[in-house]
């Protein structure tokens, strides 16, 4: 039971949305903002500090010129697809991305509090961004590493993701995407994630100079295959997550206020996350949760994030 709890933990790390709300709003390939405005990205549910999310191709860049961007920030909680990766405590992170034409590669690091006790979450990404017609496409591959885990545990894994963003008019944007991992969190289970989101940008003519305001929201659905026999052989619980919030931007700085929630029961939340602080008293499932342990790691949360983005 203890081993299953430790190994199912980083399911919390599956991937596709924003600090770009990650920097500060999610690690993944599902986020779009107005050019240069990472804070207004539509979050589709990715890991929180990766430059992969919310970094569309910037107009005016030379096709064959190597360029770099940097992001960093702090948040009152690190929420990933409705579940906390920081035990509902503050978190910090940073990322660097290099682009050359349509190609990009990057690295992000974030503080986490997970059952396997890694020293940090490290994300390595590579991919390509192209615009076809009026749709921005982003395809990328990510590797999520958790160094310093408890001896005998290993939750590192790969993921591929694709997202599309489209601006409807001056104020409305939409985004959608998918992510797939053949062995999520090294549990032996495959995972799929599908998400969509919308954004509303307050026109600049109604705002002071250098100020931006964006309202964004989205929802996603995660489903999984069976874990390895050593971990019980049963599928992890499928679930919905959703979020909505507002991002205020001043030059290179962002302030994001966001509400997150899921439809997971407290019992299924424990099965998914392996929360080491789970409490007894829940409904017993003799296959997935024979002790009836419950977790609040998937409950509703209101998160404040402050970040910067340098291009």
Where are these regions (language model features)?
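Detector for outer-membrane/organellar transmembrane beta-barrel domains
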Residues: 157-237, 259-262
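Short loop/turn motifs that connect adjacent beta-strands in outer-membrane beta-barrel proteins
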Residues: 57-67, 116, 131-136, 152, ...
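Residues that define the transmembrane beta-barrel architecture of outer-membrane proteins
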Residues: 64-66, 88-92, 118-122, 135, ...
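Outer-membrane beta-barrel biogenesis signature
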Residues: 22-70, 80-83
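Outer-membrane beta-barrel "beta-signal"
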Residues: 200, 248-253, 279-285, 294-311
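Transmembrane beta-strands of outer-membrane beta-barrel pores
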Residues: 74-80, 100-102, 109-113, 130, ...
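Solvent-exposed loop segments that connect transmembrane elements
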Residues: 226-235, 266-294
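Transmembrane beta-strands of outer-membrane beta-barrel proteins
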Residues: 68-72, 94, 103-107, 124, ...
């Amino acid at each position: 039971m203890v081993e299953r709890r430790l190994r199912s933990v980083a399911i919390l790390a599956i991937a596709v949305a924003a600090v770009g709300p990650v920097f500060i709003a999610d690690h993944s390939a599902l986020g779009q903002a107005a050019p240069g405005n990472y804070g207004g990205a539509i979050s589709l549910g990715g890991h929180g500090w990766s430059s992969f999310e919310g970094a569309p191709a910037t107009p005016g860049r030379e096709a064959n010129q190597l360029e770099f961007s940097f992001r960093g920030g702090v948040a009152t909680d690190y929420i990933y697809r409705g579940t906390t990766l920081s035990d509902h405590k503050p978190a910090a992170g940073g990322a660097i991305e290099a682009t050359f034409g349509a190609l990009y590669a990057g690295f992000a690091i974030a503080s986490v509090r997970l059952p396997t006790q890694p020293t940090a979450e490290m994300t390595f990404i590579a991919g390509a961004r192209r615009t076809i017609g009026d749709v921005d496409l982003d395809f990328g591959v990510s590797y999520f590493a958790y160094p310093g885990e408890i001896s005998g545990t290993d939750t590192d894994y790969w993921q591929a993701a694709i997202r599309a963003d489209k601006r409807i008019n001056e104020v409305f944007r939409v985004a959608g995407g998918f992510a797939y991992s053949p062995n999520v969190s090294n549990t032996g289970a495959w995972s799929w994630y599908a998400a969509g989101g919308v954004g509303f940008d307050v026109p600049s003519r109604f705002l002071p100079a250098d100020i931006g305001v964006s309202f964004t929201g989205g929802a996603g659905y995660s489903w999984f295959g069976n874990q390895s026999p050593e971990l019980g052989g049963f599928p992890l619980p499928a679930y919905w997550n959703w979020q909505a919030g507002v991002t205020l931007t001043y030059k290179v700085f962002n302030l994001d206020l966001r509400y997150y929630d899921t439809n997971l029961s407290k019992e299924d939340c424990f099965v998914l996350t392996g929360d080491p602080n789970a409490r007894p008293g829940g409904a017993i499932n003799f296959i997935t949760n024979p002790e009836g342990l419950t977790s609040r790691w998937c409950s509703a949360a209101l998160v404040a994030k402050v970040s910067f983005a340098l291009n």
